[in-house]
């Protein structure tokens, strides 16, 4: 799951949204210093990632993309699934997408001081660049993958990623819609523990 799906699964609880945002950017020692509710958001993020990585539908999708993107196939799926969440939004939420996105940006801006320095610096670009909206169109996907390539040891494995998106559009959309209700149920169950 990428930013958008993690925010969706955080149920708009501000501290959990923040925890989901910082989860991949902090070491465990730094996470231990966060308020308890934010740590719960980090734990939710990590639990969702583990559930996602083990899920048979996601594994099937990764196998389909592995010949083209190697070990980065799961990363490609994370971004593709945000695309399909946007395109299937009304199936999963009664709240308009634009309203949801603005709420997420408002939460992150309100809690900006809790973010690590790098995310504090990136957040204004994320908001002004409409990153969450951008996952819903091809140009935005291209830009997201360019950002990812700059942090990868084998960036060449993301070449042709938009071709993969087009080639497997219907299959990946079906995979997303088979998987997403199950991860929603998992996250809801996790949150009531």
Model-derived features: positions:
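Short coil/turn linker and secondary-structure boundary residues
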Residues: 13, 92-95, 136
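Short helix-capping/linker segments at secondary-structure and domain boundaries
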Residues: 28-29, 86-94, 151-156
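Primarily interfacial, aromatic-capped hydrophobic alpha-helices that serve as membrane anchors
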Residues: 77-107
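Short coil/turn segments at secondary-structure boundaries
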Residues: 19-20, 94-98, 157-161
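An N-terminal structural lobe/cap that precedes and organizes the functional/catalytic core
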Residues: 1-89, 164-193
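An amphipathic alpha-helical core segment
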Residues: 101-185, 189
């Amino acid at each position: 799951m990428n930013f958008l799906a993690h925010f969706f699964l955080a149920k708009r609880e501000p501290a959990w949204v923040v925890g989901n945002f910082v989860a991949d950017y902090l070491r465990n020692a730094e996470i231990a210093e966060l308020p308890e509710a934010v740590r719960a958001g980090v734990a939710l993020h990590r639990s969702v990632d583990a559930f996602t990585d083990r899920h048979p539908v996601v594994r099937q999708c990764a196998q389909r993309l592995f010949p083209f993107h190697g070990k980065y196939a799961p990363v490609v799926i994370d971004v593709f699934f945000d695309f399909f969440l946007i395109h299937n939004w009304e199936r999963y939420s009664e709240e308009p997408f634009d309203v949801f996105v603005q709420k997420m940006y408002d939460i992150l801006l309100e809690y900006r001081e809790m973010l690590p320095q790098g995310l504090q610096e990136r957040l204004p670009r994320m908001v002004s660049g409409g990153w969450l909206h951008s996952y819903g169109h091809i140009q935005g996907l291209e830009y997201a993958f360019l950002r990812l390539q700059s942090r990868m040891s084998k960036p060449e494995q993301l070449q042709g990623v938009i071709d993969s998106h087009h080639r497997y559009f219907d299959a990946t959309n079906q995979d997303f819609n088979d998987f997403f209700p199950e991860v929603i149920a998992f996250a809801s169950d996790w949150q009531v523990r």
